[in-house]
Structure formats: C-alpha cells, structure tokens
C-alpha cells in the first residue's frame, strides 16, 4: 500500500532507458564496475603492503642485533689475543 510495487519499479526502469538510452547506461555501468574493481585492488594492495612492511621491519632488527653481537665477540677475541 505505502511501498513501491514491482510494476512501479519496472515503469521507472523503462522511463530511464528511454531517457538515457542503452549505450549511455552501459557506459555508466562499466565505469561504475571498473571503479569498484580499482577500489578493491587498491585496498588489497594496501593490506599486502602493510604485511610486507611488518616482515621487513622484523628482519632488519634481528640482523642489527646479530651484527652487534658479532662485533662484540670480535672485540673480546682481539682483547684475549693481545
């Protein structure tokens, strides 16, 4: 009673097709689809970049610690030999 029925929606759709034409509506649909696809791709790239950044931050910290330990061991060995 207060809602829009299927027939009213069908009439609105026919009027829109008559006003804009199928070519223009197809172009708008493809533009909208490519925009959504680009948005999803950007979101997934951003998440993978965050994951890669976490991994990259983890590895250098370990390397720095190992390098510092190696330098300290070399200094101790030099002192013992002298």
Curated annotation (Swiss-Prot):
Gene3D superfamilies on file: 1.20.5.3310
Compartments it resides in: Cell inner membrane
Keywords associated with the record: Cell inner membrane, Cell membrane, Membrane, Protein transport, Translocation, Transmembrane, Transmembrane helix, Transport
Record field: transmembrane: 1-21
Segments for region (Disordered): 48-82
Any one of the GO CC terms: TAT protein transport complex
Top-rank taxon: Bacteria
GO biological process: protein transport by the Tat complex
UniProt topology in membrane: Single-pass membrane protein
GO MF, any single term: protein transmembrane transporter activity
InterPro entries, alphabetized: TatA/B/E, TatA/E
Family under the similarity heading: Belongs to the TatA/E family.
Subunit annotation: The Tat system comprises two distinct complexes: a TatABC complex, containing multiple copies of TatA, TatB and TatC subunits, and a separate TatA complex, containing only TatA subunits. Substrates initially bind to the TatABC complex, which probably triggers association of the separate TatA complex to form the active translocon.
HAMAP family, A to Z: TatA_E
Described purpose of this protein according to its UniProt entry: Part of the twin-arginine translocation (Tat) system that transports large folded proteins containing a characteristic twin-arginine motif in their signal peptide across membranes. TatA could form the protein-conducting channel of the Tat system.
Protein name per its UniProtKB record: Sec-independent protein translocase protein TatA
